[in-house]
Regions:
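HhH-family (HhH-GPD) DNA N-glycosylase catalytic core used in base-excision repair
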Residues: 1-150
Length: 150
């Protein structure tokens, strides 16, 4: 894993919308919220209907309810504060991992062209750092299913 040492809490903005606190971050590379939430690695987040954002998902992770919205180059995390965002959500969503560097490294390996195809197909997906028990249960339950069926 390549840590993105350039990502700090100084890169975020805090605010409140309709009485709900949020933390907003801009410039997150290689992040597609819809792709992350729909790729089959988590099952406790659902799309928010009627959102004013390009896409928004709400759900529970580590016992905390959160709603995450994405617009062009901006992620907004509702129902959290700067401390919780720094200690939980940065790691959960892999915002501290330099996915662009990982992609460059994979694409530079001309001996494995199939990896380049995988990178292109999975653009924007992040590996969520989920609670181990939740990930295990989701894996076991989904063994007889496929992603479209789930």
């Amino acid at each position: 894993m390549v840590k993105d040492s350039s990502y700090t809490l100084a890169d975020v903005r805090v605010g409140e919308e309709d009485g709900i606190p949020f933390v907003e971050t801009e410039g997150t590379e290689d992040f597609d919220l819809r792709a992350v939430m729909e790729c089959g690695q988590c099952f406790r987040f659902t799309p928010v209907a009627g959102t004013s954002h390009r896409c928004e998902y709400s759900g529970v992770a580590y016992g905390r309810f959160i709603s995450v919205a994405e617009d062009e180059g901006t992620l907004r995390f509702y129902n959290t504060d700067i401390q919780e965002f720094g200690s939980l959500w940065i790691g959960y969503f892999g915002l501290d991992t330099d996915y662009a560097a990982i992609k460059r490294d994979i694409l530079s390996r001309s001996d494995r062209p199939v990896l380049g195809e995988a990178v292109a197909a999975g653009g924007g997906i992040r590996i969520l750092r989920q609670d181990a028990w939740e990930a295990l249960c989701s894996f076991i339950i989904s063994q007889n299913n496929n992603i479209p069926r789930i």
